[in-house]
């Protein structure tokens, strides 16, 4: 069933308590291929988000159709259409933002969150000299020039994606040639790269959005159980930015994860599996 005209491609593996895995940019649902086998005894659902992988890609208004709430609508519909009543939802990068949006809009569907940055609380620190050197790509993605230079050009796609996979990962991680080839294959068809950056054109998770976030009243904080896995070597999100989680989440726990970078599901999948199983042990429904 399509939501707003978008159908999501997804993998569904196993049976048991439900776990939904939401990927980041510049990835797709294969970001979780090392985590899924660690979740035996669970029903694991891994979609490609709107505009990614093998899911629908429409030249629609970005704000209306590619924002966090819009992406969350598709994930919520997928969960309910599969007959799942509640799930532990995992997300990193934009998948983290979408998981949080889902927990806010449909708390009945989300039993717990296992997420890594971004999370709210950064504020105007995002405009410091260091962050500005890292977040240039978000402004670039909003320019027509980005699609003119990259969209539909496999060599340009390969060089561009490789930069982020190398720069954002920890010192012990190297993306396999096979995985990079796969990502190039799904980001290279005409329109695919442009669809993937509609998230940024919607203003979702951008530096300006981070700077404008204000803490809610204590009673309005996100009440879903959550753990925030904060990597040691993520150049986008230094650990000192973890100091305001309690201002936005009422039941969140912070866990620093040493030795890894931005791509937690690929660099340290077992830490996610451990947290998922911990939540399920407390509340297996």
Name what the model sees in each region:
Residues 26, 50-53, 120, 261-264:
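Alpha/beta-hydrolase active-site loop signature
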Residues 30-44:
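Short amphipathic alpha-helix adjacent to the substrate-entry channel of hydrolases
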Residues 6-8, 18, 30, 45, ...:
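Flexible "cap/lid" subdomain of the alpha/beta-hydrolase fold that forms the substrate-access gate
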Residues 24, 93, 266-267:
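Conserved acidic functional residues
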Residues 16, 24-27:
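Active-site glycine-rich loops that stabilize anionic/oxyanionic intermediates
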Residues 21-24, 46:
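Structural cue for short, hydrophobic secondary-structure segments
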Residues 251-285:
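Catalytic active-site module of serine/aspartate enzymes centered on a nucleophile-bearing elbow/loop
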